């Protein structure tokens, strides 16, 4: 989860019930590019089964929606 630790920390600090990010905003938080698969496969954003999911799940959020056309995602506090 080391690569995704900045996202985890950002989400932990948030008091919002819902957070919408563009993929670019997430890349800015990470100070790193998302893998190409994040832009192509909805499954990359699944709530579990992948190391990146630990960053939002452990911070108390779940993915609510993913828009692969407009490159944005909504997290909801779980």
Outline where the language-model segments fall.
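Positively charged, polyanion-binding regions of nucleic-acid-associated proteins
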Residues: 2-19
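Nucleic acid-binding interface residues in structured DNA/RNA-binding domains
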Residues: 30-78
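Generic cytosolic/nucleocytoplasmic N-terminal low-complexity/intrinsically disordered segments
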Residues: 1-2, 76
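Alpha-helix initiation and N-capping motif
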Residues: 4, 23, 49-50
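Short glycine-/small-residue-rich flexible loop motifs, especially phosphate/cofactor-binding loops
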Residues: 8, 24, 53
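Hydrophobic/aromatic-rich, well-ordered segments within soluble, folded domains that form packed cores
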Residues: 15-35
């Amino acid at each position: 989860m080391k690569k995704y630790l900045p996202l985890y920390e950002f989400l932990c600090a948030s008091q919002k019930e819902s957070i919408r990010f563009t993929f670019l905003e997430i890349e800015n938080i990470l100070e790193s590019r998302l893998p190409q698969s994040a832009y192509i496969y909805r499954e990359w954003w699944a709530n579990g089964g992948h190391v990146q999911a630990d960053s939002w799940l452990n911070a108390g959020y779940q993915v609510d929606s993913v828009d692969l056309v407009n490159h944005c995602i909504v997290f909801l506090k779980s």
